[in-house]
A protein has these predicted regions:
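Beta-strand-rich domains and repeat architectures in extracellular enzymes and scaffolds
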Residues: 33-65, 80-92, 240-242
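Beta-propeller fold detector
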Residues: 34-36, 77-83, 120-123, 157-162, ...
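Conserved beta-strand positions in repeat-built beta-propeller and related beta-rich domains
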Residues: 56-60, 98-105, 140-144, 184-188, ...
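A short helix->beta-strand "capping" segment at the edge of beta-propeller domains
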Residues: 23-41, 71-75
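Beta-rich, blade/repeat-based domains predominating
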Residues: 40-51, 84-95, 124-141, 166-180, ...
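Short loop/turn segments that connect beta-strands within beta-propeller blades
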Residues: 69-74, 112-116, 151-155, 196-200, ...
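Blade-loop segments of beta-propeller domains
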Residues: 74-110, 116-128
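Hydrophobic, well-structured mid-protein blocks that either form specific transmembrane helices
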Residues: 108-165
């Protein structure tokens, strides 16, 4: 009987320790290192580096585009516009292809990463929001608290429940893979979360409040959305929908 009681006590301690560890979410804010122009007509949905250029996908019906952007100037050096019936969402490059989701059209597109030529359309079973890759799988969000790991034909390999302090965290939007972690914009907030891809736990939050100052905002300025990591320089860039600036940032731990 005593052994059973001892085992129960040990299990309780382990459970409490695990819960305590899970609750210790690190908190960061951003420090602007440098700012760049960003096309204020771009409703940014996907953003990632390809060499020294950025690939950006933009949304809204009648405004959706796939662009190669010079980050120094914010200007598109190559641009493709989608039919008005498509609302494009997140995008990423994997194995020589650029994958692009759509919001509610139930399709996803594949383009050649070098030429930007159209290659294929796939059916897609859910809303498209954000998209990134761990180098092997596509990782997609749909606005819920789940992330979906997919192969190159959009077949689901696994689903990951994202939790912060033990509770599901929804509204996960644009995604970026940085140093083995998944960074996600939380839609309609100034917060980015850093997610452990193995267990779905949020390990840190990034507070971006005030990143775009008031004098650069107008009636069309929308939410923070757009994370890009340059693996060559190890630099992180942030922007938003209809923002006039792109920012290189560093993380500063909150005290």
């Amino acid at each position: 009987m005593r052994w059973k009681l001892l085992i129960l006590v040990i299990l309780t301690i382990i459970a409490l320790s695990a819960s305590s560890c899970e609750a210790k979410v690190r908190q960061y804010k951003v420090k602007v290192v440098k700012e760049y122009p960003h096309d204020e007509m771009s409703y940014t949905q996907g953003l990632f580096f390809q060499g020294d250029k950025m690939i950006e996908t933009t949304g809204q019906y009648g405004e959706s585009t796939l662009k190669v952007v010079d980050p120094e100037t914010g200007k598109a050096v190559k641009k493709f516009s989608f039919a008005r019936k498509y609302f494009c969402e997140g995008s990423v490059e994997l194995d020589g292809n650029i994958y692009i989701l759509t919001w509610r059209e139930k399709v996803a597109f594949i383009y050649d990463a070098k030429t930007l030529e159209y290659k294929q359309t796939y059916s897609y079973p859910r809303e498209g929001w954000g998209l990134t890759t761990d180098g092997k799988n596509l990782i997609a969000s749909d606005g819920s608290s789940r992330l979906y790991f997919l192969d190159g034909q959009f077949h689901q390999q696994k689903a990951l429940q994202v939790k912060m302090n033990g509770r599901p965290l929804s509204q996960l939007n644009e995604l970026e893979w940085i140093d083995g972690k998944i960074w996600a914009n939380v839609y309609m907030t100034d917060m980015i979360v850093i997610i452990n891809p193995d267990n779905g736990n949020v390990e840190a939050t990034v507070d971006c409040t005030g990143l775009l100052p008031r004098h650069l905002r107008d009636e069309y300025t929308d939410v923070l959305n757009g994370i890009a990591y340059n693996p060559e320089t190890k630099k992180i860039y942030l922007t938003g929908k209809y923002w006039k600036r792109l920012y290189e940032v560093e993380l500063v731990e909150k005290k």
